[in-house]
Amino acid sequence: MDTVIDRDLHAASAQPWDLLVVGGGIYGAALALEAARRGLAALLLERGDFGGETTWNSLRIVHGGLRYLQSLDLARHRESVGERGWLLRHFPDLVEPLPCLMPLYSPPRGGRLRRPAVLRAALMVDALLSRDRTLPRSRVLGVEETAKLFPAVDREGLRGGALWHDAVVPDAHRLVVELLRWACRAGARALNYVEAAELRVEGGQVRGLRAVDRELGRSFELKAKAVASCAGPWVRRVARRFDRDVPGLFRPLLAFNVLLDREPLAPGAVAVASRQPDAQTYFLLPWKGKVLAGTAYAPITEELFHGRIPGEPLVEGFLRDLNAALPGFEARREQVLRVLWGRLPAAVEGSATPAPRPVIHDHGREGGPRGLVSVSGVKLTTARSIAEKVLGVFASSGALRLADRPAEVERPAPDPPLPLDELTRLAEEDWGAARDHLRGLVQRQSVLRLEDLLLRRTDWGIDPVRAESAARLCESLGWRASRARPAAAGGMG
């Protein structure tokens, strides 16, 4: 646990950088790691907390690209399988195999995709193209075996089930932090609550940017050869600020998942859809002893929102869809613990269909500042492979020179928090030891706010009921709420 995410603004502004990464979600963290491994001095800036927006609100499934076989996109299937394997190998403490079961029905329910013959062929192709996979082989099950694994399955017209394995990252927020710890070990730095305010350009070439510490409101300058914007839903806004609007970068749609206070339906994820031929498929998977269901999509409109969550009509409609897909499930609004929502890129303006492919926009090639690249990703799985492509764009434009091969930098030993029950017990037995554990976590992982601690360094605050007791425990152990504090204090008195 020797690797620290050190929020040292003075040190960051004192040296020149090869690459500034704007955005601290999964895409920014992966790019910071790959840049550092390729010999670049990389600094990541996140205007909020690491992994606090789209990444935190995701369904947490690491897909292997089975759906790409429907369109015969073999290259993307292979990429997804490879990246899923990379995550499983390098983060076995955070990424685990996930059995996925899709019930299969007689036509017309579910269209061609849910017919046994079609799924059997797709799974066979998937196996042939994934010979180096480490997950169990996929197979088509009979009716009784399907019902045994998924007792709540709708048996009307049931002809069996397709069973395959993907992966899941239950603590996606910790995956971001562990990527950043690895990047820091490789020589990068990462600063949260720092906003990229203004690009510095000389002679058409990126020279750095002006940044703002959002904790204290102070500006400082950063010198760099190149800037990559991985700002997620804000990538288009950053493009306007640094260059000009690029509509194709990000056309927003609403995406949300719902955490239900229900017992898990099966050991892994189940894929369900209503009896309408073109009904959307939803996944329901176990998460923290509850059921996480999604993903639902809707066009972005003002009337969708009441405050910061999707409006009640959308949530109620989603629950109706789930209940139609699973007669007898009877999910109710009062069982909703959290609505995890965010913005994803849409295929076209005003659409409820997600964009099918990521976008990498080299501003210099379009008459903008040379050394500025914007990235809009579409799935968690391929964040690292997209990072490699972004570095390739910088290299081909001459903005950056990369080492021929990534350096063999060993990932730091994981730095997990204690489970909340264990910390509570430790506080009762040895208050000082519990306080030291909390203080160390806060200082090593750049925790500035209590929300960051409860939701993005730990899972203590995911259940709203437990969140209150977790907050009281942290305050009893010395957490203080002052925002205007030195980074070294880390919120611990």
Where do the model's predicted regions map?
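Glycine-rich FAD pyrophosphate-binding loop
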Residues: A36-N57
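Core beta-strand elements of the Rossmann-like FAD/NAD(P) dinucleotide-binding domain
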Residues: Q15-W17, L216-A226
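C-terminal catalytic lobe of FAD-dependent flavoproteins
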Residues: R174, W182, D245-L254, L259-L292, ...
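Flavin (primarily FAD) binding-site architecture
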Residues: S229-R244
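A conserved short coil-to-beta-strand element within the FAD-binding core of flavoproteins
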Residues: N192-R207
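Dinucleotide-binding Rossmann-like beta1-alpha1 core, especially the glycine-rich loop
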Residues: R60-L149, Y282
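Helix-loop-beta segment of a Rossmann-like dinucleotide-binding subdomain
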Residues: L129, A147-A186, G208-R210, A296-H306, ...
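Extreme N-terminal leader/targeting segments of oxidoreductases
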Residues: M1-L19, E34-R38
